[in-house]
Amino acid sequence: MTNPMQATRKIISITDQNVVHREDQVAREYPLTIYVNDREFATMVCTQADLEEMVIGFLGSEGLIRFYKQDVASLSIDESRGFAYVSLTKELPTEWQFYSKRMIGSCCGKSRQSFYFHNDAKTAKTSMSRTTMTPEQCFRLMEALQEQSVIFQQTGGVHNAALATPEQMLISRTDIGRHNALDKLYGYCLMNGVPVRDKVLLFSGRISSEVLLKAAKIGVGIMLSKSAPTELALTMAEELNITTAGFIRDGRMNIYTVPERILTPKKEVQ
């Protein structure tokens, strides 16, 4: 049976001493075109898994869905043709065709100017989370994410994201697209009524501005990554009151924004 998430390819592996012909695993790409109320809305190139969650999470992050049961009349996916059909209980906003357009807007009414999609100022949430955690909990959660990253270990070609409490990881999702992995998590939360304000977001890739915005739209207050952030992402995190920590590996980490949610040791070295 064909694995929809990865494929086997014959490759030539070269080192400084050897040339080896062998088989290797590579991640598959799957295009999915989303229709909303019979109108073509977006095409996403993704990993063919958890597609319903991804569609719902994407529409939620675009501001079209707030409550799954109230806002979605029907959802069906034709995986053989690569189409998703969503019927909403309300009409599309008149400005829906501009949702994918880049524009410059201010964050939550502040004067600082940052790059946002058309509707980001309305859908990005300023975090009011009171969740706190220790560095040791951060290390354990990131180790758990790594252990769950089976497809990445086999292919090296996907991103992993997870939702957790400070004590344990709750759910993880995988995709070739970093945004898609986050949309899958958000979709799961919307479809299952999972509260997110007290949760922690774990991520395998860098924290870019668009990734940070996804976290804000999901509604978490803490985002942990094994990789680096960008300067614009940190500016947004400060404005949205989101704690960001990166380079979490080998018992080390960097805290970039809103550090009071990470309970650091009292002894500090200047």
Curated annotation (Swiss-Prot):
Gene: fdhD
Pfam families: FdhD-NarQ
Active site, renumbered: 108 (cysteine persulfide intermediate)
Positions of Mo-bis(molybdopterin guanine dinucleotide) binding: 247-252
Gene3D superfamilies with a match to the protein in the record: 3.10.20.10, Cytidine Deaminase, domain 2
PANTHER family: FORMATE DEHYDROGENASE (PTHR30592), SULFUR CARRIER PROTEIN FDHD (PTHR30592:SF1)
Biological process (GO), any one: Mo-molybdopterin cofactor biosynthetic process
Transmembrane stretches, start-end: none
GO annotation, cellular component aspect: cytoplasm
Function: Required for formate dehydrogenase (FDH) activity. Acts as a sulfur carrier protein that transfers sulfur from IscS to the molybdenum cofactor prior to its insertion into FDH.
Record bears the keyword Protein biosynthesis: no
Source organism of the structure: Halalkalibacterium halodurans (strain ATCC BAA-125 / DSM 18197 / FERM 7344 / JCM 9153 / C-125) (Bacillus halodurans)
Subcellular location: Cytoplasm
Annotated protein name in UniProt: Sulfur carrier protein FdhD
GO molecular function: sulfur carrier activity; sulfurtransferase activity
Cytoplasm is among the record's keywords: yes
Key words of the record: Cytoplasm, Molybdenum cofactor biosynthesis
Domain of life: Bacteria
Family membership noted in the UniProt record: Belongs to the FdhD family.
